[in-house]
Design a protein with these regions (language model features):
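A generic short-segment signal for beta-strand/edge and adjacent turn/coil regions
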Residues: 14-16, 31, 57-60, 90-93, ...
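Conserved, compact domain cores that house catalytic/ligand-binding motifs in diverse enzymes
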Residues: 55-130
Length: 195
């Protein structure tokens, strides 16, 4: 089954909408097809496969932050082309140069087209996801809006920390912006010490 939600945002130029869908009751090692629709625009059919529990390959990407995502798009596409049997991709943070700039998020999403619409991805935030439009540290609101991540960490710090299993590997994703976290959530370390 599937359920979805939309979030309206503004990048200072145009309104944008971020849509999420949560799929449940998927079967292990099964291929699925889907497509998206916005108004009268319907995408082509895309497919993905769920974890079968066996050995797997992942494409791991470093910082992709850029003023122009043309080069990054070519690098990401080539890495995936050379690893078409990859089960998932992992992006190690600093996806965009400025975390509150919606234009950069849209450019990053376009640069990952053909990859993230076919295999699942695990993303983590870097310090660039924490920049405001005036280049000061800020809560990573755009990052948190763009990704619907497993909700299995501390409820007060949703999507900053999460974990998931793929095959026989347990992945743990951490947010290492410790000084910023302490500023935004002053009781974080005391609370976690008691857990």
């Amino acid at each position: 089954s599937a359920k979805g939600a939309a979030l309206k945002g503004n990048n200072g130029i145009t309104d944008s909408y971020i849509y999420t869908a949560e799929l449940t009751d998927l079967k292990k090692g099964t291929a699925y097809e889907y497509r998206t629709r916005t108004g009268n625009t319907v995408s082509g059919w895309m497919d993905f496969r769920t974890d079968d529990g066996g050995a797997f390959k992942a494409v791991i990407y470093p910082d992709s932050q850029s003023a122009d995502y043309t080069g990054w798009s070519k690098l990401a596409a080539k890495a995936y082309e050379l690893n078409k049997d990859a089960a998932l991709f992992i992006s190690m943070g600093d996806l965009v140069d400025n975390g509150q700039d919606e234009y950069q998020w849209q450019a990053w999403m376009r640069s990952m087209k053909g990859i993230m619409d076919t295999i699942p991805g695990a993303v983590m935030m870097g310090n660039h996801e924490d920049y405001s439009l005036d280049w000061k540290m800020a809560k990573p609101d755009r990052y948190l809006a763009h990704f619907h991540l497993p909700n299995n960490g501390d409820a007060d710090y949703k999507d900053h920390f999460y974990s998931f299993d793929w095959g026989d590997v347990h992945f743990t994703v951490l947010d290492t912006q410790l000084n910023e976290l302490k500023e935004w959530y002053p009781d974080l370390f005391e609370r976690e010490k008691g857990s």
